A protein has these predicted regions:
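Structural signature of tandem-repeat unit edges
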Residues: 1-7, 15-29, 39-52, 61-74, ...
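Short, conserved catalytic or adaptor-binding loops enriched in Gly and charged residues
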Residues: 13, 184-186
Length: 205
């Protein structure tokens, strides 16, 4: 099929020129890095046949908006990472594993913050209370954010969570026991991290 390399229901590679793309209904899995680096891809229609979106499937694409159907049960790491034009992610309300809030992607129970839409123009973001994990590459490539705050409920901040956020200057981590990956701020060693030591004291790292 033109523009798509499909093997046994898996979309292995997109070979087209971008723009608005409709994925064929014969596809059940969007493979790892299938659209990686497709800067001219602005819109994609994911059919109800798709159950899995692989790691880095749309990494560094030109997507402006993406809609995830109810059929998708697994989204791999950094599937929509470093999409610097992406302003909103929506999830079908009948999806059992994922949901969206304010255009960002979460696990259905709201405990894992999976992906911030990196093209948003807001300069501040407060991770909602109840989130326990800030996921792999969650804020990767955000252009406009200067300040982010994570609540006491956050237990883990994973690899590359704030990687290459070009405007980021401060991250406030309110959980005194929050585990922060050594790679969470990869490429941004100059970010000021404010960590809660106890209820009355902050320290600057």
């Amino acid at each position: 099929m033109k523009d798509f390399v499909i093997e046994n229901g898996m979309l292995v590679e997109y070979t087209g020129e971008g723009g608005s793309v409709v994925i064929p209904e014969s596809v059940t899995i969007i493979g790892n890095s299938a659209f990686f680096g497709c800067s001219k891809l602005t819109d994609v229609v994911i059919p109800d046949s798709v159950t899995d979106i692989g790691n880095s499937a749309f990494f560094d694409c030109g997507l402006i908006h993406v809609s995830i159907p109810a059929s998708v049960t697994n989204i791999g790491k950094s599937a929509f990472g470093y999409c610097q034009s992406l302003t909103s992610i929506t999830v079908d309300k009948n999806n059992v594993n994922y949901r969206d809030t304010d255009g960002n992607l979460y696990s259905k129970d709201g405990k894992t913050f999976i992906q911030y839409a990196a093209g948003k123009t807001e300069t501040e973001f407060f991770v909602p209370h109840g989130v326990t994990v800030v996921g792999f590459s969650a804020f990767d490539g955000c252009k406009s954010l200067t300040n982010v705050e994570t609540p006491e409920s956050v237990e883990h901040i994973e690899d590359y969570a704030f990687s290459l956020c070009e405007s980021l200057t401060h991250v406030s981590i309110l959980g005194p026991k929050t585990d922060v990956s050594n790679l969470a701020f990869e490429g941004r060693d100059d970010v000021i991290i404010l960590r809660t030591v106890d209820s009355d004291e902050n320290c600057v790292q």
